[in-house]
Amino acid sequence: MLFLVALLLASCTNYARHQLDQRYGLANPARFDHPLSIPSAVSYRRDVKPITDSRCAVCHGCFDAPCQLQMGSYEGITRGASKEKVYDDLRLSMMAPTRLFTDAQSNAGWRLKGFSPVLNERHADTVANQEAGVMARLLKLKSQQLFPKAGLLSAERFDFSLYRAESCPTIEEFDGYAKQHPEWGMPYGLPALSNNDQQTLVHWLEAGAPVEPPQPVAPAQFDRAGQWETFLNGRSLKAQLMARYIYEHWFLAHLYFDDLPERTFFELVRSKTPPGQAIQLITSRRPFANPQVPRVFYRLRPVQGTLLAKTHMPYALNTARMARIKSWFIDEPYAVTELPAYTPEVAENPFVAFAQIPMRSRYRLMLEEAQFTIMGFIKGPVCRGQVAINVINDYFWIGFVHPDHPIQESQNFLATALQQVNLPIGEQGLSSLLKWRSYARQETDYLRAKSTILNQALTGNNAPNLSMLWDGDGNNPNAALTVFRNFDNASVVQGLVGEQPQTAMIMGYPLLERIHYLLVAGFDVFGTVTHQLQARLYMDFLRMEGEFNVLAFLPVQARDTVRDHWYRNAPDDVLAHLHDSQSLLFKNSGIVYKTDQPWTELAGLWKQHLKPVLNQRYDLTGTALQQDLGLLRQLDSLKGKAVSYLPELAFITISDDQKQAHHFTLLRNSAHSNVSELFKEELRRLPDEDTLTLVPGLLGAYPNAFYRLNSRQLPEFIRDIKQLASEADYTKLSARFAIRRTNPQFWAHADALHASYRGTFPIEAGLLDFNRFENR
């Protein structure tokens, strides 16, 4: 039966294709590879791109864009759409990578990879450009339907769930799509474009979607990029090994020169050609894969496409940073006798591949921009999806072992020991799950060796105390970070936000490096479900190790109590691992505690110790709404089951008496009995322990809701939240304070948020993503 249905659908598609060919000619995928910049009243860069960015790329931006249609660049639009999902929890074989600007160099190449056009690739005339293009047809379909102006959208007609079935019609399938889903024009599930924006896009499409030549890189930017390329392509073995290490840690970075007035972002890529020649990209699934060339050159390529909040990771380059890197990697007295191989047993283990580089040098590179380092895990492709990200708690702090503390000598030994500990990186098949016990044994053996070393080192003045924590050298706010998980995504910010997190982690070089290679450099978003589960399971060990480091700062007699609270009702194998690991460290803390709540006390001492370098950006005391500070703190302090009805991440706009808008982020921190199980997270939820965190400004890339109120409504808003006892109660609160998907002011409000974001933090700002926006 299924075969007959498939055969019928294929026949219908072939017939539709024949009809289109008869009317508008044969499709030519190369048509937009070198588009003509024909005279047109509409400019792509001046008129069209601002619309496709603010109305289209906010849902169609990256790997998780519906149908892989990325609309943040001209090349993304001309590439088109695919029916294959990047994030597929059931994938048993590796998927061919589909990275824009990387895995195909022409639209014909993308057609061979299964992408279908959304622009007209047939004969170019006004009628064909409208009738034979999916994008034009979707815009027209939206304009033909009346969209609700209030209330909720029908759950029967609109599915906003993360793993919903996608409809990715080709032009041959579009008539059937429009007949079956007349309300599914674009933007999907959001208000239609304004008449002016609609006409701008229609006129551009009618003209054949012309585009101007790309703007050349400014001479000052070009020269500065050349200086860094020269630095990263030295001939000595030392310089080559340094460059390889830097690349494997910066490959996701958006590099910029912070002392130049113009802002251009670059990405570090591997090339077959040296500086001064056109880049010939070396493409590979992972940054440490064999480049298949005698010499790799590291080049700076301008970032193409719109910056997205969920992937934008700015990293400043300047002469001071170059000098520091040179002092760590070149001036340091060590010898590089040969370059490491790219074989899996070497390349997949950074403690083997870079053993010749002093550990302190490696640690310093990661530590100096620790937020960026952790952001690779948080913003990298691993963190899309609940199963991938539920390995961490909803709200925790991160600190780092001081690179110059005597305890680092033991870290050197541990880094050497990790040459024998494998990460589950390269294996993709189901059989690799059978090796899980082997990984567990290796980790247990490593922790025993670590405990032996620490028990010897943590004596006298070296007993665990706050001097062991890196203080940012007195001026670096990367010394302390806070992570917020929002169900299936997360955010990391500088500072110790809030008064007491759910848990915390302290990392030294070995742990930081392993997390990077497990979840950033070694993670394959196009890999199998087995590979992704292995990474998630192994991260359990690494998270526990970071928490184990925190427990060492507590009195011996308090450690079990705190640990058991973090791991309530955890599986027996997890508890056995925890008890074994924790019992191995018997040295007491060097901190003198004055209360019977040492975990709470430690959080306060930690904040006090790092106060000179803590980033206070997310402290409510800095808000301009000083007259309402008490109410804001009251909202921030709410906890319990009532707050569990709120979305994970909401942006609140509060207008003062002068009608000045002030933006805040409200985060719901979901409590769990433990985070050491893969599935059925809802069974481990503890809604009575949920808390809220309110911070000034915008934090996070995936808002679930927008709230708008004036400052005089704050008491009522807080009262209504306190009284939430059902989904129906939340619907009433939303009806009063939320800007829902159906609100005609939705786009104007989104524009105001983006304008505020760019105006306040122009370097880090990127487009927000509305794929998780609620319909409640």
Per-range role (PLM):
Residues 1-5:
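Sec-dependent signal peptide recognition
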Residues 8-11:
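C-terminal motif of bacterial Sec signal peptides marking the signal peptidase cleavage site
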Residues 13-776:
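Aromatic- and Gly/Pro-enriched helix-to-coil junctions and flexible linker segments
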